[in-house]
Structures are given as C-alpha cells and as structure tokens.
C-alpha cells in the first residue's frame, strides 16, 4: 500500500483551512511517502490476535474487524457497553434507526436543528473509550522505537465486510447529522468539575451542558466537542498553555478542532522526528485519543475496534530500527481489516514496481479501471485533484503511459488511453506550479475493487445471504462510498451530507423502500437544495424506465446512454432536473458531462455534453413523475407564461411549466446573483463587499466556483448564464453571449450583459440559435420579436455546445441605428419590477430597444437581488460603430486593471452663500467628500463602484449619494476611447457623451435644471471628473487644476482663488518669501533655481503666494491642517501622474511630491487617536477571509520556512544561556523604550540594566507579571500615529531567541530586514536593471491591522521551532524556558492591550512594539503574497520578491498575472493602497525609492526636514550623551529594593544631571575607572609630547578604547562620542584636545563614529553580535542656501572632504567639480533620502567663500549670510556607481537621470576636428554652430585619472585634438546676451527628453565626455 500526505481543504467546518488531520496531512516534510512500502501491511500480523483480547480494552471494542454476519449493535456485550456509554436505550430496529436518521436530517435542513438526538450522538463520541483503546495499544508498543508520523491510508475505512457496512448503513444518515450538525454547533460550559472522565472521575458526563449554539446558522464556525476540548486541554497542559484555554469561545472566534490539531502536530511535535518516548505518556495518549475522536472513524458513531483501527494508523507508525534512513515501519492496524482486499493482488512483502514509481514524482493517483467507465469518473478526478487519495495496485501488467506536458503523465491498461482528451483531463487537476502528478488507471479485480452494476457500486464482499448477487448487495457501497472515499476536495460537511443523501437515494431505488421513506427523502432533498443548490444530489445512472416516461416531452432513446452504444450523440444540455412526487419537489443539477460508453475515450471526449439523469423511485408509479428540462438556450417569458424551445423554434405550452420555477430556480438565481457580486473585489476597495445573500452560504458558493468552474470547467470553457437570472430571482432568460474565462471565482472579468427590451413588456424579444445551412455543428444566432419573426439575421454563429459564440457587431450596429434605445426602468407601486415604455422615445412599428453595456459584479452587489436595480430612468446610450466589434474580444479584467485605474476627480459642494467647497481624490474612495460636507453641517454619503472597462479605456462609473434628508442622487460618468474623461451626468436627458469638454451639471434627480458653474445653485452638489491620458494634457492643465485644491477642513473656510498676476505682485521681484515654514522656503527656493518647465515655476510662484496668504489669514494650527491636506492631495496627484510620465514630465515629478513633509512634524495632539486607531487595530473583530485562505497560508508558511531557513547552530557568538545573556547589555541594551510593571516607569533599556542586577532582570523576564501592551501617540511628519509599546519581558525574550537564531536567519534576500550589505547593493542594482516583466509595488493600507491571530500565531510557533532547532547544546534548556515564557505571554489568548476603559483582549493585528515586529511583518507579508499567488494560480509568474514591513518589491511576468494576483488580495479582504500601486514594465518603488532603468532616486522634499531638524548637531551632546541623565536616574521604587550595581558608574542614586555632570560621574567614580582614565591620559600625553609615530599612536588608541570600554561598560560608539567632548579630558584638555584635532587619532575617531550613524548597517549587529566593519565613506560638504552671489555658488568640494583616509582616492572626482545647492538636491535624489545622514549646523557666511576651520568644523567669516553644512554619506554613490566606470570615464555626478557620457568614436580620433565637433554635437543635441561657440575644450590625461588636472586649457590648434584621447570638460556659460542670445537653454537644445535636462540652473554647465 502506498501512503501519502496532503493538506486538508477549506470547508464550512474548516474556515481557516489548516490540514484536516481527520484525513491525515501534517507537515509533508515530516514524512517522505516514497520511503514507505507495502511492508507496513504485514509486519505485525500477530497484532490482530492480541489486540482485541487485551483486558484493558472494553468489551465493546474487541470485536475483530473480520467478524461477519453479526451486527455489532445487536451484540449483547456491545449493547451493555453502549448502555454504559449512554446509548443502548436508543438502539432500535434497523429500519427504525434509518427512518429516524432520515427524519432528523429532514428536520435539520427544513425546520432547524433537532435537539433530542444530540445527547445520543454525544455519547457515541466518548473519549474515555478512545483512551482505553489507546492505552491497550500502547502497552504493546516499544515507545523507544515508536515514531509519530502523518500518514493517510488508502481508504478512510476498511472495506470488504458485509456486516460492517450493514451497521454503517443503519447509522450513516444519523452520522451525517452528527458530523455536520452536532460537532459543529455544540456549546460547552467553561466550568469543569473533578469528575471529568479524563481526570480520573466517574464514567458519567454531568459537567457539560450541551445545547445548540447561536452559530447554528453559520456552518463555517465550529466549536470543539466536549471530549475534544477536554482531551486537548489535557494534552496541551503537559507542554504549555500556548494556543487554547478551556473555553469554547476561543475556537468560535479563532481556531477550530482540525486547526488546533494541525498546529499541535506541527508545533509541539518537532519536524525532526524523535521517538515517542521523548514525550510524556499522557501527551501521546491525549494526542492519539484526539486523533481518534476527530478522525474519519469518529464519523461512524460506533466504537467498534475496526473503526479505531482505521483511524489510528493514519498517525502512529512504529519503527524497530534506529537507522532513520532505512527503517521498517508497520501500522497498528490489524491486517485482517485489509487482507481480503489484497488477497489476490499484492503480496505482503512486495513494493511498487518501478514502472509505477517514476523518479521525481511527488503525487500519484491510481484509479481502478471500473471507475473509468463509470459516470462518476469525472467526479473522482475532481475530488482527487488536490493530492493522492486513492492508491491501488493491480497485478495487471498491461500498462500504457502517455505524458501530459512536462508535469505529469497518464498510465492505464486501457487500450485506447491515447485517445483520451488529455488536455481536458489535465485541466481537471489543480497544481501549485511545482507538483508532478501521475494518473494511473489500473486494471482491477472484482474481488477487491467495487464493480459497477445497475447504477451503483458494490463492495468486494459477498451479497446478502452469502450470495454473489452484486445487484442486491449492500447499497451503502454505492456512490456515497465513493464520495466518502475520495472527498479530499469536498469538505467534511458537504461530503457527509452527500454521503447520506446519495446512500438514501440508492436505498430507495431498491425494492424495499416504502413510500413514506421516499416522500421523506424527497423533502430532505428539497431542503438540501436550498442550502446547496448546485450539488448533484440526484445522480445514479439512467434506467431504462426513463424511456417509458409519460410527461409532455418524450426524449429519444439516444438521449439515454446504453452500455452497448458505441458513441454518445448528445444534442442538448441539461441544467436542472425537477421531480414532483406527491406534491413534494426535489431539485437537482447535473454536471455538464455525458454518460459513459464501452469506449471511455469516446465518452470522455464528449464530456462537454450533458444528459438527463433520472432515477427509479422505488415502487411508485412513474406516472407520478413529471420533469421539465431547461436548456441554456431556452427562454422563459414570465409575463406571458410562455417557454420557447430554441432548438426547434417551437413554443412550449405554458401548462407544462408547473415545476420549473420552484425552489431550485430561486436558489439558483440567488446563487448566480451572489456569484456575480462576491468575487469581483478589486484592489481599490476598502473591504470585501458582501452580498445580500446570507453569509452562511458563502463557503458553499465559493466551493462551487472553485471546484466546478475552476477545476472541472477549466480555463478554456465557460457556461453562459442569462441576464435575468443574474439580475433577479423571478425571471429566467437565456441569451447567447461572448466567451469569457470563468475562472477563480470570476474575479478576472466583469460580466458582459446584453440587455434587450421590446415594447411594454420584457422577455418577448430574444436571441435564438438555429442551424446554419450546410455547416455541420455550427448554429446561427438570430434575433426574433415577440411574434417569432426574425428581426436580425446572421447576428452571429455559435457552436452546438455554445462554448464559442461570435456576434457580428456590425450587423447589430446597423440594426441598432434604426431603433431608439431609451427604455426607462421605473419601479412600480407594488415593488415588482416592470418595464414601462417611454412612448416618446419610440418611433416606428417595432418599438424595440437594444442597450449594450457592462455590469460588473460590483454593480449588483449594492442591491438586493429580489429588488429592481434601477428605480429611475436611465438615458445612457453610447453609439455603436464598426470598431466596437473588438470590444467583446478585448473584454477582460486584467486589461481593465492594467489600463491605469486612477483618475482625477473633484467634487464641489455649493453652500448657501454660493461658496464652492471643492474636494478631490481617487473617486473610488472620495476620501474628503464626506468630511467636507459633514463639517459644513451636512451629511453626504457617497459610494462609487467601477462598473466596467472594455479594454480601450472606456469606463462607466455608478455613484449613489444620499443626503441627510433622504434625497437620492445618482449619476453615471464615463471615459470614451481612452481620451480625456470630462464628465457625464445621468439621468439628465440633455447630457450627451462628448469628449474634450467639461460639463458641470447638478446631481439632482428632482430638479433637472442645467446649471453652469458661474451660476451655482445653493445646496447643489456638483462633480467634475478629469482623466488625463496624454502628457500634454497634464502639462497644460496642471496649474489650472491646482488652483482649486486649497481648503480648510476644520474651519469650513473656502480659500479664494489667487490669480497668477496677483500672486506675482504679492511676491514681487524678491524671489524669496518667508512662508513661515523653513524647509518649505528652502525647498521652493531650490526648485526655483533649477531648469524646469515654465509652468512648474509658475506653479511654485502661485504655491508660495497661496501659502503666504493662508499663513497671514489663519492661525498656525489651522494653516498647518490646511497645507497638510492640500499638499497630501498634491502628492497623490503627482505620484499618480508620475506612474505614467513618459513625456515632458519625465522623472521630474518626484521634485513636486511629498510637499507635506516640508511642514515639519504634526504640531497638534489628537486625544482620540488611541480609540480611533487602536480599537480597529487590535480589539475589533477580525477581517473575514475565504475558507481556502487559511489552509493555503498554513501550507505556504511551513513550506517557506523549510525552504528559506536551515537551522544552524549559533557559531558566530558564544552560546550564552539566558541568565548570561541578561548580564550582557551590549547584546540587548540598545536604545529605545521599554517598561516594567504597570506604573508610569518608562525606562531606557540601558537604564534598566543600570538599575537592576542581572538576577532581577532574569527573574522579571521569566517569572514576572505579564503587563499589557500600551498604546502611545507618535507625532510624525504628516499625521499623529498610534504605536503599541511592549514590555521589557517580551523584548529581552525575543532578543535572546533572535540571538540564538542569528546564524540561521541572517543574510536572507527575501527581506531587507535580514539582508547584508552585499544583498542591499544587489537589490539596488536589480531595481535599476528593469529587465523583463512588470513591476508591481504592493503596499497594504494599515498593514499592522491586516494579519489576524492565525496568521501571526503560525509564524510565532514556526519561529519557536526555528529557535529550538538552532539552539546550541549548552543553551537548549534556556531556549525551552524562553519559548515557554513567550508562548504564555505573547500569544494571543493571553495578550491584552490597555485602553481607557480597561484592558482589552487582542483579537487581531500585529503590535508595533515587539522586538519581532519587523521580522514577523516581513514573514507574514511574504507568506500572504505567496498565498495570494497560490490562490490566484500566479505562483509561477513571480520573478522576484523583496519585502519590508508592508512594502513589497514584486516583479512578475506579465500584466494579466499581476492583476489577477492583486485582485485576489482584495477578494481576501486585504487593503492594497491604490495610491501606491501600479503595474509598469519600467518603474518601481520600494521604501520610498523610485527605480527606473539605470537609476534609483528618492524624493528630494523628504530630505529637507532631515537636513534641518532630525539629525544630530555635533556641537550639542550626542543623543547617546543626552541619555545619560536617564541612565543616572534610579526611581525610588527601585532604589528601595534593588542594590545599585557597583560596576556601572551611573547606577548610583543621583538627582537629574545634565550630560556634563554625567561625564563627571564617569570620570571620577568608581575609583578604578577614574584611575584607569588618568593612567591612559598620562600615557597618551607623554607619547604625544614628541613626534609620534602614527602606527604606534593608532595601536595605542585602540588599546585605550578597548580598555576603557571594558571598564566603563559603555558601548564603543558611545565612548567615542564622549572622547570628543572637551570636558571629558579634564586637566589634559589643552594638550589632548589639540591632539585629537590635529593628529590621525581624530580621523580614526570620526571614522569609527561613522559606523554608528544612521544608514544601512551590518546585518549581524541587529542580532547582538559585533557589527561588521563599514568603510567610512563620508564627505562633509558646505552649500549656501542663498545664491545671489556668484562666487558662493561655486564651491570646492575637495577642500570640504573630512575623511582624510579617502581624500586622495576621490581627489580626481571632487577637486574641480563645482557643486550648487540644486545640484546637491538632485544628488540627494539620486542617493535616496536614507543616505543623507547628518546635518551639521547653520553658520554665517560672508560675501566671499568662507574659510573652513577643521578644528571647529565650521565656516567662519566676518559677513552675515545663511548657509548650512551637510554631511553626505557617499559610500552608496561612489562605491556602487563610480567604481563601475572605466578609468577612461568620469561619471557626471550632477546628472539627474542616468549615468551617461558623450563619446567621440575612435574612428574620428585621428580625423579632422570638425568631425569631433560633429560627434559632440550629435551626442549633446546642440546645433553645430552652438557647439563651436560655447565649447571650451580642456584636456585630461586618460591613463592617470587620480592625477588628472583640468587647469590647462586646450589650445585652439584642433589638430592636437585629433591626437588626444581623453575626457573633455564642457563649460557652458549661462549668462548670454547679444550675439549669444541663441545660447539660452531652450535654444541650446534642452528638451524635456534630453538626458541633460534640468541638471542645474547655474552659471556653468558641466558635461563629461569620453573620447
């Protein structure tokens, strides 16, 4: 037997979708299936003899599985035992039990749950008996040789025994109710008494109050059964209180049984297999008992030993060998249970033949031959598609193999296997992109494989009474058995329900079913159709009695298959089967596949055809059976009661439509309406839009979509649904439509709907299909009127199956041009939808209208399906033309999303005093509209949904607005042909669709009055949509658009417009105006000096004037809010436009972005920030996910962990124990906040170490209280954000595990959090490469709020695993303690957050204050991404992925796959920020760095605040020094109980000190520290008295720093800061300070200080190990902020280089390059804001170039002028860019866009100089005349770039130039007049696309030209 592993699938009972362990399926990495042989079946044969006789086993469980013809329930011993278990009183006659089960099932699905049966079934799930069996089994097992695996047997049950099946048939329906109803909807009291059976109490069960849960209407919620709850609590209590408490509420809110078991197996059992003896016996005992309770055996409600035997072996395998690579396994399974099944087939010791085990296969599906020829074969393929489920080997040697592509093959003994439609078969399987599947169809023997006979399958045993009559065999072994056996892809609830119902149907087809049973069964099925309207509940072949059917329609015999028919000739499809028996209706739906024939290949190729499937109803007369078949192409007119048979053009009599509009159609219509509404969530929606249909049916519909449309139908097939079924439940209409890929829950495409109206009634006009003359298999689409006359001929063609439909839109357009299409839809008084014609809109006799539009699923989701969608007239009739025929072909959601879903919108609210209050933003959110109106005293609710996009840019939007008074406003807006979208308002009959103009129209239905903007109506609402698809439109309208975007939300003010002339007059000619915001002033001044387009300079002038006016009129707080709102909006618009900028905007859009950061930090506080942010963050209900999300997420997380992290024992640092780690603060005592306890005692981590001894820190971390999380306010540049502060306990515990895992998790390229320097460099290089594919930056909104407890908990447990596996031997005990402590304090059942009204339990969300927040965020983010890719079938298209926090740098193969992926994000409820999302082949953004081909740039505006305010000024104490007062301060509480540390100078209790006093403490206390400092100072003083040797001085300095660091316990970089302070040196200040300023020692100190400054750091330093050495590539530069004096604009960078170590290295780069402030900004943009690391200070400058004083590090002068000293980290520029250049090329460091040089070809070097000039002219873009006028050529030697000089001007002898190979410096004078008037930039050839554009607007241009 072959064993396999797999993951469970989501279901209503498994909402989180973990591996369902009742089917097996722990971590697939635990077990290698290919290593398991058939030896497992026969290794322990004697076990079956002793197992049942064990005295520990109760009598009820000792009946061996092989006992036959003795009903278990009738055994006295078992009855007694059952009585002891509480079940014997309910033991009844076989027929009574069956009827009772049927009645109970009927009551549940028709009237609600039936309570009386629940206690009876509870007693059948008794865990005491299960534990007794476990104990009996374990007594015979050598625990030292036993291992626990995750195995799944071939069958969930052991087959082949008549008696067992008889018992199961009696209780199968009840069992369905037990598993779907009872175990799903139990609630259990939290109180437990000591008499619990598992705690040694009595055998009774008095402590649980079993009742129906309130979640009975939500089948996807599940609570744990009492026994399961108790067993699991017992099991987990032996390890730690990690996941659960004794409350069923936990499971209701977060986890459910299978999830818990999965986590239990994955988390508590190490992935490295260890002997069972490593665990406590009670843990193994409880685990196996829980497995038994929840396994498939529990479903039998029977405690026979055979059930136990078939459950336990899935998980317990015993090994008798210590050699893990070559061990013999056997199952604790009596061989008698399987011996008959294999008696003729498989030898006990045999293994799989090589032919059936190809190398590299990871999954195999073996299917018996008999099943291939059955009508259930397609079902089996679907149900086994997710993993190996059915393995059976035959001795048949006839094997034929056919390869299926590159990932699988089909092997079969069937001769015509090659004739199978392999592509269709392949489409039935779902793959994750990596699996290789073998489909092996094996010849079978009747002795152990069920033969197929009379529509049912029978088991391999004997028939009733020992006969071989298979026709009278046990009916349970029919289709229901197959569903039970192969239902891995069918959830537990559905499969069991189908098992019961199908068994019931097979039962009533036999002769002994009573009429009462049949009636009850039909009622059950009718109720079932309400819950599962699309399941094939009635399907059991096609009896010959079908031909004797006497209904109104007599099908031909060819519609019913026969086994002797060579070929199926199906000519019509069946979508519904309606059966009426005794006035009770049963409805079923057949799948679209035909019946089998002898030639399975012939039958399988006809799978797209469907047949009527009937069943024989016992002994009832067939005359009572009526059915109506509705073909997809049939059309029902509800208003006239007429039904058209489109195939024959005949009208079906209305008398025969008695049952076709019953329950089934209502449910089906609801389903399709839901189908159209649920899955179309896209990335631009905040939350998942829910349908009016109840949420309980969501998983049912989802399963149908995913399994039957995605898997079975396949990507290339689609079923065409009709308009009215989608729009409501009262009408049915069949309309041919275009082929659409129905895939992945329809999220890929909107639904194209053809709306057709005729006259005053609806439905009499329809499209029919008739055969095309002379063409076999092709049908013609025509349109008929209500009299049957053809209105339009040859409208299109369609295949008989209608898989492909092609419409001739040119003919439709010609017909349409003769008709009027305005058909209003008006709600009638009775609420029913009726269509009343607008008589004024019709002309001619036909009165026929045809409107073609799109309705996306979003369109329907806003309305109840039972109500009319439109209640007002609509006049939106876009004209058709010949080009519109491509619309259908181009229709797809990927095209819609890739077209750029952003557009600009502006809403104007007109107040009573005619003031316009504009607001704007992305129209799908309209972020400011509600705020403006609400704060203006009105209430306006707006909802907008994107309804369609035809792929060419045309859009339709539907928006519904509602005011407080209840008045409704609706309007349409559209973009036509990809051109400018201006505005379209409906319903206004006077509005026409015209591009190129803006229409201002009131959105008021009552008052259809044209209103101009110049004449506003008070109280009206206006809207303007603008869509710019051309760069010219953006440039021309940018300034105009920005004028209306200023507003004051808090004060309800309207800012009047400032005309451009008024703005200029206000500003005057000064060119510089103080706006009150220093950073904004400087930045605008910088931009004003740059060579930018004229309209941008005009905009800057206007912007500055606006800011000044607002600052003059309002208070500073109001001004801040106004400008913050306006600038944020400006950033959104500019970034949106930057996504598409390819023309004149180029990359300059980054200069206009992030103006809001120039305002400084938010100056106001928001007291309600905690409630507004923390409540939805941590304490609100979790966001609902689809059921398949959690199973995929769990599988992906485990696979990602094993693929990414290989446990490596810590080697880079000493393996410290946790106690030793607490005493090493240099490993964990970093800067940052933390707190201990509940009081207001905020400590820096250094101060905690200084105040507490190591023992106290150790005790607090492991055994102290667990304080709750604390929310705090954090002001930022653009908002006040809430952060969650965690305690020191969690910090130091997580730090320790991170320290242990340092060598395991470092240097991982999937996240920047774990990257090293080389990987960071490669990331930047990769971002600049832009080779192939598309870039998809995915930024989740409020990422910390997105993960729920399950997502976070999974990675917490996996990290615990990783830490345990990485722990050195010496630290294993410490790691176990830390993990246990973390599991009890940071996992969510025990995690709380402190709010104003008390501590609240954390329900979801990732706290921001954990040490692991960044790591967990990265892991969760990448797992979510891989999960979304798995669910959207786009995993194979991922090219590269890097994450950090909520940002993802993602590269994919194509746009369609990217769109599908992001659409899946929205469908799962994840909010993707639309402002930061796009799909582009040549642009990416990651961590605020924009990447385009050849360059990675930042946002220059973001660096200004950092330059001005955020970075440390050296003249003031470092931030480390400023911490010293805290370090020296000990709270009174600590002072009383904790003795100060003697080895830490600042631990003494002192008053608050400034840093100088702290230095004094450091210098003078304790004595040995002071003495050490004194000795070293004397030594250094004596050594430097003479001329010191630099090498000796360097060595001396290092010894000094090392000794002082060790003595003072100060980190090295903190000590280096102290060494620079003059006060530190005391009496030696004169000599030593001079030494530090003038010798090489100063350079060493400065260089080493550079290591600790902000910027990329060594990866290892984050884990507490010593940081790697970083080269100090820093340059200190000075640039003036005033540019009036020309001499100040030219600065010598060479004189400003502070790092003498690298000065010579960069001399040729910086000596003669002149740098200006705009150039610096561009340079900073090139580097990114993260690399501008230090602002020194503002200084005073004179009119001349100031002299640099290296001692004071200042610029000194007598004059007064503002300037600033900037320290730039150039490592990431020089080393990553400059070093890649050849010695012949010096890059243009001031270049904005790309690294480019102007080259003179070698062929012209020895030619005439004119050719060289011509080459330069072509390269630069100048005219030849201009080149001759402006170029002053200078020479630089090529071979010695370091010694290059540019001082010598090149002579005018051009012949010398021909002999010179080198780099040319081109100096362009900027001031031009007179003869040089043509040298202005515009005439110099500066165009927007030139690479030289906007380098800087200085007096000289620099070009670097390589010869």
From Swiss-Prot:
GO molecular function annotation: hydrolase activity; nucleotide binding; RNA binding; RNA-directed RNA polymerase activity
Disulfide bridge map: none
Catalyzed reactions per annotation: RNA(n) + a ribonucleoside 5'-triphosphate = RNA(n+1) + diphosphate
EC number: 2.7.7.48
Domain of life: Viruses
Positions of the UniProt region annotated as Disordered: 42-61
UniProt feature, compositional bias: Basic and acidic residues: 44-56
Gene Ontology terms describing biological process: DNA-templated transcription; viral translational frameshifting
Function: RNA-dependent RNA polymerase which replicates the viral genome. Catalyzes the transcription of fully conservative plus-strand genomic RNAs that are extruded from the virion into the cytoplasm where they function as mRNAs for translation of viral proteins and also as substrates for encapsidation to form new virions. Once encapsidated, the positive strand is converted to dsRNA by the RNA-directed RNA polymerase. Displays ssRNA-binding activity.
General remark: One molecule or two of Gag capsid protein is replaced in the virion by Gag-Pol because the fusion protein is essential for RNA encapsidation and replication.
Family designation: Belongs to the totiviridae RNA-directed RNA polymerase family.
Identification of the protein by name: Probable RNA-directed RNA polymerase
